[in-house]
């Protein structure tokens, strides 16, 4: 993709592109952006490349991150794209929501657990307890005027190993005013055939929901899996500049051009 040329959004009617360079991309070993660098990259992504959405940070990481998010939100507001700026937040007694609000943002990508193992072993909660905490956080975010998207962390493992748990959670979550469900292959375990199978099951079971797919490149399949997800009903793709990201990286930004086709 030519980074100096704006993406032609007229070619994509349904597929949203969310660039995660400033959040997941910064988890690349040895990569760290200063606040002014984050603002510069955000300007490029929102204005020059014209991606639909950007995820710019994880809440409550540092004062430097808070400064960067505030700068990006101020800029995005001046060009009418504040709704395109998203921040990863946590189920943490509303601290993430307040942090994002203090930065001037109002879109939270709330991190919930998409596998029984993550729920019971990481959080040491029952699914019912986790669900209650999620609902409370969403209620609070909505009271502050937020748009809420929801990550189902470890979704791919959940579909493979604990589908009953995942569907029980989704059956309740779809009743809430969640705008998008973000489905990550957190450990990078999927191949394209599994991606097709799992995404189709989600789309068929929850036909009125918007699903994003978030790939990891551990087996060099992030691009293939992302395209498989789109062909199977995903309405959003998560990408990063040059495939930056945790461990082996994420789906490449210029893959969105292939998705256009």
Where are these regions (language model features)?
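Catalytic cores and adjacent flexible loops of soluble metabolic enzymes
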Residues: 1-253
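Conserved small/polar residues in nucleotide/adenosyl-binding loops
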Residues: 254-261
């Amino acid at each position: 993709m030519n980074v100096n040329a704006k993406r032609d959004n007229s070619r994509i009617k349904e597929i949203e592109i969310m660039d995660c360079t400033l959040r997941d991309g910064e988890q690349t070993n040895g990569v760290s952006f200063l606040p002014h660098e984050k603002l510069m990259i955000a300007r490029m992504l929102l204005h020059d490349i014209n991606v639909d959405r950007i995820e710019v940070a994880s809440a409550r990481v540092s004062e430097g991150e808070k400064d960067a998010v505030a700068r990006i939100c101020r800029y995005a507001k001046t060009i009418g794209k504040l709704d395109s700026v998203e921040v990863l937040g946590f189920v943490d007694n509303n601290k993430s929501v307040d942090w994002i609000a203090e930065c001037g943002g109002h879109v939270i990508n709330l991190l919930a657990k998409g596998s029984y193992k993550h729920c019971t072993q990481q959080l040491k909660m029952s699914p019912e307890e986790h669900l209650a905490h999620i609902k409370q956080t969403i209620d609070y975010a909505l009271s502050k005027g937020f748009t809420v998207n929801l990550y189902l962390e470890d979704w791919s493992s959940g579909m493979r190993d604990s589908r009953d748990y995942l569907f029980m959670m989704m059956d309740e979550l779809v009743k809430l005013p969640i705008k998008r469900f973000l489905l990550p292959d957190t450990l990078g375990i999927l191949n394209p055939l599994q991606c097709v199978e799992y995404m189709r099951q989600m789309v068929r079971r929850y036909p009125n929901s918007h699903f994003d797919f978030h790939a990891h490149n551990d087996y060099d399949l992030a691009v293939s899996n992302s395209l498989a997800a789109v062909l199977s009903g995903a309405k959003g793709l998560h990408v990063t500049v040059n495939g930056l990201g945790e461990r082996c990286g994420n789906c490449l930004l210029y893959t969105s051009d292939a998705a256009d086709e």
